[in-house]
């Protein structure tokens, strides 16, 4: 498997180093105050400062930090994306700086706390006594997965206030600020944990249907498209609330927006996560049950809620190429992120029916990860060839659009330069790659290339 990042260039180094300069100056100031008391230690302190600066710069050279200059745009033939480039030009420098700062904070926090995934390394870490069956099951799945790849990219999507960041807090044990009415995540960002040599990356994204209006939603979608460009997505978690009873237009609107902008193949390896699963349900859910019965109404509501999403996603999954055997149904998991969540004797978070929710989510996620069905997101290339509203399109137009996308993709990493290849070589490459791309211009099966 390989990963193509069209934003990876020499310009990233310059922006990263510039974002690290304020911290470097702070370090030099501290060392300077110490050296004033003794002139003999000035040379040693300056050498230490240089070493620290090098470590800072090497740490900030991260592909996950989005940075794109005008020079890079021209070299990658992305200048036609006026909607994306114009909206991001003014905030580009600040975004790169904020992302670099956040990456360092997550690295420090992640090394200190690992609430659940630690059982994959050693049973009984920190005094936790997880069931032997649970530990062996997860370790076996991880071993099989590591035999194929050593990294997994999970994408979090959903409306504002449904608990995306709270779910991330539960999995990684970090403390991301959470607000209900406005999206607490302003820009997409990747949080990572390395467990027993396997790296789990969860991409947190801004919420939709934000109280700030449609313009914010539109800008957030552009941010997500830019951030995902060139990244391989292994699975998607769509987050919604467990306590709601209706599957209304708001749910459909958000799902349809993601399907239109990112492509239906997004849901090939996806699951729905229903948060606030242990909250009090509406009174109608308890009709026909005893007053002291909490498990019966909870199970009935969970099954009804899961059925709503399975029915809706069934229509989307039917759009995928059937020769890849897409799933007919999408899995649905209940999740409780509150710190007051009930726990079993082993210290695991449990739902009202006694099910360990985090165990089910993580094990289900590992089962979904299949590198053969992972897709390389190339949304910035697909948008370039989008036909007008009045144009119905035909087979020839679709084939020409895909050929244009292949040409742009090959220009990113073909050596020698793609433009210097002979016509016969180019024709042969385009013919072979044309069989690998789907109708959206993406690469759904990376291992077959």
Swiss-Prot record:
This is GTP-binding protein A. Disulfide bonds: none annotated. Residues 1-77 are annotated as: Disordered. Residues 149-386 form the AIG1-type G domain. Residues 183-187 are annotated as: G2. One of its GO terms (molecular function) is GTP binding. Residues 8-46, 67-77 have a biased composition (Low complexity). The keyword Zinc-finger does not apply. Belongs to the TRAFAC class TrmE-Era-EngA-EngB-Septin-like GTPase superfamily. AIG1/Toc34/Toc159-like paraseptin GTPase family. IAN subfamily. PANTHER family: GTP-BINDING PROTEIN A, GTPASE, IMAP FAMILY MEMBER-RELATED. The lineage of its organism: Eukaryota, Amoebozoa, Evosea, Eumycetozoa, Dictyostelia. InterPro entries: G_AIG1, GIMA/IAN/Toc, P-loop_NTPase. It comes from Dictyostelium discoideum (Social amoeba). Residues 158-165 are annotated as: G1.
């Amino acid at each position: 498997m390989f990963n193509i990042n069209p934003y990876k260039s020499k310009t990233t180094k310059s922006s990263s180093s510039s974002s690290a300069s304020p911290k470097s100056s702070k370090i030099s100031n501290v060392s300077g105050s110490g050296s004033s008391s003794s002139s003999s230690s000035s040379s040693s302190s300056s050498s230490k400062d240089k070493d620290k600066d090098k470590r800072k710069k090497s740490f900030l050279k991260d592909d996950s930090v989005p940075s794109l200059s005008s020079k890079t745009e021209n070299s990658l033939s992305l200048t036609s994306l006026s909607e994306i480039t114009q909206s991001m030009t003014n905030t580009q420098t600040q975004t790169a700086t904020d992302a670099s700062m956040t990456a360092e904070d997550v690295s420090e926090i992640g090394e200190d706390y690992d609430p659940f995934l630690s059982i994959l390394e050693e049973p009984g870490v920190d005094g936790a006594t997880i069931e032997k069956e649970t530990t062996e099951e997860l370790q076996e799945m991880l071993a099989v997965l590591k035999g194929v790849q050593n990294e997994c990219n999970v994408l979090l999507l959903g409306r504002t206030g449904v608990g995306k960041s709270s779910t991330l807090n539960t999995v990684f044990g970090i403390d991301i600020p959470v607000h209900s009415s406005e999206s607490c995540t302003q820009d997409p960002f990747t949080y990572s944990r390395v467990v027993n040599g396997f790296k789990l990356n969860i991409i947190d994204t801004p919420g939709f249907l934000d109280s700030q209006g449609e313009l914010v939603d539109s800008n957030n979608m552009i941010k997500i498209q830019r951030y995902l460009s060139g990244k391989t997505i292994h699975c998607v978690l769509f987050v919604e609330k467990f306590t709601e009873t209706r599957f209304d237009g708001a749910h459909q609107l958000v799902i349809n927006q993601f399907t239109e902008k990112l492509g239906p193949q997004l849901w090939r390896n996806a699951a729905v996560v229903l948060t606030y699963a242990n909250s009090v349900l509406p009174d109608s859910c308890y009709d026909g049950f005893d007053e002291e019965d909490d498990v019966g109404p909870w199970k009935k509501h969970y099954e009804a809620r899961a059925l709503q999403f399975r029915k809706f996603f069934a229509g989307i999954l039917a759009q995928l190429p059937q020769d890849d055997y897409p799933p007919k149904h999408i899995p649905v998991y209940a999740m409780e992120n509150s710190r007051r969540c009930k726990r079993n004797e082993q210290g695991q978070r449990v739902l009202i029916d006694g099910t360990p929710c985090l165990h089910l989510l993580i094990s289900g996620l590992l089962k979904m990860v299949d590198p053969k069905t992972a897709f390389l997101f190339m949304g910035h290339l697909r948008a370039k060839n989008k036909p007008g509203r009045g144009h119905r399109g035909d087979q020839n137009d679709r084939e020409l659009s895909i050929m244009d996308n292949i040409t742009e993709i090959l220009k990113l990493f073909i050596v020698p330069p793609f433009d210097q290849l002979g016509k016969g070589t180019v024709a042969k490459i385009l013919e072979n790659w044309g069989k690998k791309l789907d109708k959206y211009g993406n690469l759904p099966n990376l291992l077959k290339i």
